[in-house]
A protein has these predicted regions:
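Conserved NTP/Mg2+-binding pocket subregion across the NTase superfamily
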Residues: 3-23, 99-186
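Amphipathic alpha-helical recognition patches that constitute DNA-binding helices
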Residues: 76, 131, 199
Length: 237
């Protein structure tokens, strides 16, 4: 069993935000409180991604292709509800955003990004070992727990289930890779546009990255986070 799977199955989810600066902790407490007020049947609010792992980027400015850009990691948050929020999800997220950014400098303040799952769907994904959701359980921080439900453990899948999951992963990643490859070909042939021509290398890297990501997803049902092609090649051996 992978350490990753062990953590997801047997180690309780983290609850402490002590590793984050006070400003970040305050933001996350505020967001959890607003979510509970705006969504009445919320059962869990989970921080995942770079802020959960402690690998976040607070502010990074650089110049790429002659354009000055800046990057900030988002607060990635999974909102688990009794039933999916549904068609009005974006409206709900907009209200949460509006309240959170009140009296804040929106352009240079960490933004929240939300996804929503019902507790039933979330637990089904955990039982089947869907790597995205299993990773959230293993690495995430529980910001709010109603205590009304327990999270499922990964169970042993039969070969039919393994095949279905692997096929879905393959279709998605292979489609992404081919999409990047087609755009790269078009850009390479369009030498009249220097920017498009220069972007070809980046697009080819994205295509190769997605092709390589597909292999461990299909054979291990695991998605590596690395973007280095050499590391992904090693993972495929």
């Amino acid at each position: 069993m992978r350490l990753f799977d062990f953590l997801a199955n047997f180690v309780p989810m983290k609850k402490s935000l002590a590793y984050l600066p006070e400003e970040k902790r305050r933001d996350l407490r505020q967001l959890a409180a607003i979510i509970r007020e705006e969504i009445k049947d919320v059962v869990m609010v989970i921080l995942y991604g770079s802020y959960a792992r402690g690998t976040y980027v607070d502010y990074d400015q650089r110049t790429e292709f002659g354009v000055r850009t800046y990057y900030m990691s988002d607060y990635d948050m999974l909102i688990v509800t009794k039933r999916r929020i549904g068609a009005n999800a974006q409206s709900v997220y907009g209200r949460i955003d509006g309240r959170f950014f009140h009296n804040k400098a929106k352009g240079f303040h960490t933004r929240p990004e939300f996804i929503n799952e019902s507790i039933g769907d979330f637990n089904r994904m955990l039982e089947k070992g869907q790597y995205f959701y299993t990773e959230i359980k293993a690495q995430g921080v529980m910001l709010y727990d109603s205590k009304d439900y327990k999270l499922a453990r990964r169970r042993k899948l039969d070969f039919t289930e393994i095949g279905e999951i692997a096929q879905r992963y393959f279709i998605k990643k292979f489609a992404y890779a081919n999409g990047f490859l087609e755009i790269a070909k078009d850009n390479f042939e369009n030498k009249e546009s220097p920017i498009k021509y220069q972007m070809t290398a980046f697009l080819l890297h994205q295509a190769a990255e997605n092709f390589l990501h597909a292999i461990p997803l299909v054979f291990e049902l695991y998605g590596y986070k690395d973007h280095k092609l050499s590391a992904l090649l090693s993972a495929c051996k």
